[in-house]
Amino acid sequence: MPSVYRPLVNFVAKAMQAVLNLALLCLGIILVVFLGKETLHLAHVLFTPEPVSKYKLVEGLVVYFLYFEFIALIVKYFESGFHFPLRYFVYIGITAIVRLIIVDHESPLAVLIYSAAILILVITLWLCNSNRLKRE
């Protein structure tokens, strides 16, 4: 690439990074609002005397952790020099599959497949945390 285009390329890269940062900041604020809403929902379900409310409480807790993990991912993005660590996506994947097992546990074969997916993600997490792939 000719050196004439270098300033233009740098400007475009910085402008796109600024747009991305602003969008992630907005997404983080929205997720914090939803986290607050989920907190109120969990408090309501906790004091509901229905027997079904225990399943809703556990499902709500897992959704709460999903919001929490996405917010932590956005925070880590800004702390780590504008990149997403892979292991946070793996944490989110494991939590999402656990939520799926809690909500939809009708088919034993499906639960077995979801459990195998969790095992694969845990192995991936182990590989990501090994010294060969660790960046942080």
Curated annotation (Swiss-Prot):
Keywords: Cell inner membrane, Cell membrane, Membrane, Transmembrane, Transmembrane helix. The chain crosses the membrane at residues 15-35, 58-78, 82-102, 108-128. Its main location: membrane. It is a multi-pass membrane protein. It is found in: Cell inner membrane. One of its GO terms (cellular component) is plasma membrane. GO terms for biological process: cellular response to phosphate starvation. Pfam families: PsiE. NCBIfam families: PRK02833.1-3, PRK02833.1-5. Belongs to the PsiE family. This is Protein PsiE homolog.
